[in-house]
Amino acid sequence: MDVSLLIEKELRLNGCERTGFDTLAAGPARSWAIHAFPGYTNGEWPGNGLSILDFGVVYNGYTSDTTLAVAKGELSPEQEKLLALVQHAADECLRRYKKDVPVKDACELAEKIFAKENRKMPHTLGHGIGLEIHEFPRVSTKMTADVTFQPGMIITLEPGLYDEKLGGVRLENDVLITADGNEVITHSRIIRL
C-alpha cells in the first residue's frame, strides 16, 4: 500500500479529521528536493538510501507537522555525516526553544552548525502551527530580535540538509513553549532499516 494512503487510513481510524497537507513520501532518488513533486511514489518506499516522510494531521481543528528521516541499507560515510549533522542541529537548537529567546537565535545556531561542515540549510528552521499549518512566527534569521518564543506557542523544529547525490535528511518535531522551557509533543526521529 502507498505510504501516504496508509497514513490517511490510520489517522482516520484513530479519530483525526484529515491530513494537515498532502503527505510527502520521498524516496532516495527524490529526498534531496525538499518538497518533491509529486509527494507520493509508486516505487519501493523506502528504498536503499535516505528517504523523507513529511506529514501532518488535523485533530480537533489543530494541525500537526512532522518529518521522519528514514535510512535504509548501508550508507556512505557522507550520508552518515548528513544524518549526524541534522540530529546534532535538532538537539542543540531545541535548547534555544524557550521563553524570551529570539527565534532567530535558534536558526542562526543551526546555520552555524551546518556551516562548519560546508553545508547550508535551504529553508527556515521552523514555523508556528495551530489552526493553520504555517503560522507566525517563522524561525528564521530574517526575524527581528523582538520576536521571541513565548509560552503557549507551538513551533516546529525542522533542521534539514539536502544533496542531489546523497539524498535529503530532515527531522521535524512540534515543540510547545512552556513557562520553564519546552515540551516536544511529537516523536519524529531517524529510523534505520
Give, region by region, the residue ranges found by the protein language model.
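Active-site neighborhoods and metal-handling regions in enzymes and metal-associated proteins
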Residues: M1-L193
